[in-house]
């Protein structure tokens, strides 16, 4: 397989990932609304730790575990930033 074919497959996966991440962010909007209504804080460390543990168990190839968990940590960090922004804009 040549590099262009590999990159084409990566591009296809990127498209799928973007669609899944948008669906995830739609759910983050619902979480934000819930937190706004209940006064819960944006950061839930126990939830994030549970997600990272669960994700780590899902990874089948040990060599990928750390990178995939780091990716999910980044996703959750971006979700927190988004939630904080939405909550701050709602208060104004």
Task: Locate each region found by the language model.
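Domain-level signature for soluble enzymes in the chorismate/prephenate branch of the shikimate pathway
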Residues: 1-92
């Amino acid at each position: 397989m040549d590099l262009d074919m590999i990159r084409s497959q990566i591009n296809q996966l990127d498209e799928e990932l973007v669609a899944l991440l948008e669906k995830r962010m739609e759910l983050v909007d619902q979480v934000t609304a819930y937190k706004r209504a209940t006064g819960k804080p944006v950061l839930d460390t126990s939830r994030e730790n549970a997600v990272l543990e669960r994700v780590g168990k899902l990874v089948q190839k040990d060599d990928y575990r750390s990178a995939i968990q780091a990716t999910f940590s980044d996703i959750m960090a971006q979700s927190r930033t988004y939630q904080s922004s939405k909550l701050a804009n709602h208060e104004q």
